[in-house]
């Protein structure tokens, strides 16, 4: 338990750091640790002179109070370590304020916040910047055990789309999921459907950064989707009697969820990250949605759009990793696909595709044949094309599309598994 709370770096003195490392190693090997065994360990590692040899170890053992209060002592060490980190970070922030160099003020604020947030996050989790392979293997094995015990189920955040969740095992922490489509294909709708299900099912917080639509517009979409209410009637207010009970039900469900909407336009990566960190600190953040990537801006970098998109893409992946949550980033597609016979999107259709393709863990495209062919036999159907999946399979998932409800739904299957 103490090993979960402390690391050797939490000790100020070098000799105490070494003693804690030695105790940790002996403990992991289920070997006893006292002045004699520790002295032998330091002798075998040629480190005895750095800790004062056996005499100092004996002195420590004799002057140490009872082990009954060991956790309280460990918490004191941890608290002092946090205070030293704050002093160090505070000094760095002050130095940056005096000599900012070429960095803009928003960037300095973001860096300062990140440094303080890292200390707070490490204080909660006890996690350090660097872990040994042994520690990483232990975490991997524990995760494998969980996956083994939940075989056939979703290990990440569920989206509510059965076939998609089966292929991806849900939205995984630290993954950047890029969802791209031509206008009117339903990319905002699909992202909101995933967000609403994740929030209602997992009870985690979901934050949607909407740089295209207002918060009230998204709220109406969510009400339409949850309540199965015609979006057109919601827009005009011409509701039927049965619609009101559905509106009430949908609003009750949504008001009890932890969905947050930020509709500030043209967010910078630094500002978006700052807002997401705040939600992470105050709530159990489970998912971030960005609508959409090309509407973000990087201050002072407007001359080269490709470079700007590259920086935005990298920042979103870094955010997913830092916050340990999946990030769904919506993206535009080039108009070029409209001139092709087969208008199903491919990787090269991503606008400023190079960096996005590289940074994304999953790339999804939406294709609805009825949009291009009015006599299509696939009316009401949508293809969600998993074009890239860094840690799993690619393929196509078919969903029902209900435009009037701003909603996608699972396709029903018959007894032999084919789609009805």
Residue ranges and their predicted role:
Residues 285-330:
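Helical hairpin unit composed of two closely spaced alpha helices linked by a short loop
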Residues 183:
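The conserved Walker
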Residues 186:
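Conserved glycine(s) of the Walker
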Residues 118-175:
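Pre-Walker A segment
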Residues 273-285, 314-324, 335-420:
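C-terminal regions of RecA-like/P-loop NTPase motor modules
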Residues 166, 189, 197-284, 298, ...:
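Cytosolic-facing regulatory segments adjacent to core modules
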Residues 54-114, 118-125:
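Extended, charged alpha-helical coiled-coil/arm scaffolds that mediate oligomerization and mechanical coupling
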Residues 1-82:
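Noncatalytic partner-interaction/assembly domains of nucleic-acid and motor enzyme complexes
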């Amino acid at each position: 338990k103490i090993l979960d709370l402390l690391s050797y770096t939490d000790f100020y003195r070098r000799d105490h750091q070494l003693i804690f490392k030695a105790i940790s190693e002996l403990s992991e090997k289920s070997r006893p640790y006292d002045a004699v065994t520790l002295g032998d360990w330091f002798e075998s590692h040629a480190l005895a002179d750095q800790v004062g040899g056996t005499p100092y170890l004996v002195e420590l053992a004799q002057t140490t109070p009872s082990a009954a209060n060991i956790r309280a002592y460990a918490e004191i060490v941890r608290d002092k370590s946090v205070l030293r980190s704050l002093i160090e970070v505070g000094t760095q922030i002050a130095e940056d304020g005096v000599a900012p160099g070429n960095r803009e003020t928003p960037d300095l604020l973001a860096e300062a916040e990140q440094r303080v947030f890292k200390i707070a996050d490490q204080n909660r989790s006890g996690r350090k910047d660097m872990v040994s392979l042994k520690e990483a293997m232990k975490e991997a094995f524990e995760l494998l055990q969980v996956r083994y015990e939940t075989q056939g189920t979703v290990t990440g955040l569920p989206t509510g789309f059965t076939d998609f969740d089966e292929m991806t095992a849900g939205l995984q922490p630290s993954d950047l999921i890029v969802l791209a489509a031509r206008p009117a294909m339903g990319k905002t709708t699909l992202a909101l459907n995933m967000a609403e299900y994740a929030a209602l099912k997992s009870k985690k917080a979901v934050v949607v950064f909407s740089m295209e639509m207002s918060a009230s517009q998204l709220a109406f979409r969510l009400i339409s989707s949850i309540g199965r209410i015609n979006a057109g009637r919601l827009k005009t207010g011409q509701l039927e009697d049965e619609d009101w009970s559905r509106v009430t039900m949908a609003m009750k469900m949504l008001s009890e969820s932890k969905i947050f909407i930020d509709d500030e336009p043209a967010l910078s990566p630094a500002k978006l990250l700052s807002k997401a960190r705040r939600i992470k600190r105050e709530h159990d953040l489970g998912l971030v949605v960005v609508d959409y990537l090309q509407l973000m801006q990087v201050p002072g970098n407007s001359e080269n759009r490709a470079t700007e998109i590259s920086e935005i893409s990298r920042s979103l992946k870094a955010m997913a990793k830092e916050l340990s949550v999946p990030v769904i980033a919506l993206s535009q597609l080039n108009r070029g696909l409209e001139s092709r016979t087969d208008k199903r999107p491919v990787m090269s259709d991503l606008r400023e595709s190079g960096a996005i393709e590289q940074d994304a863990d999953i790339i999804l495209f939406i294709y609805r044949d009825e949009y291009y062919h009015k006599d299509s036999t696939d009316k009401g159907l949508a293809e969600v094309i998993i074009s890239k999946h860094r840690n799993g399979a690619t393929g196509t998932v078919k969903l029902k599309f209900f435009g009037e409800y701003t909603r996608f739904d699972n396709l029903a299957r018959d007894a032999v598994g084919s789609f009805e």
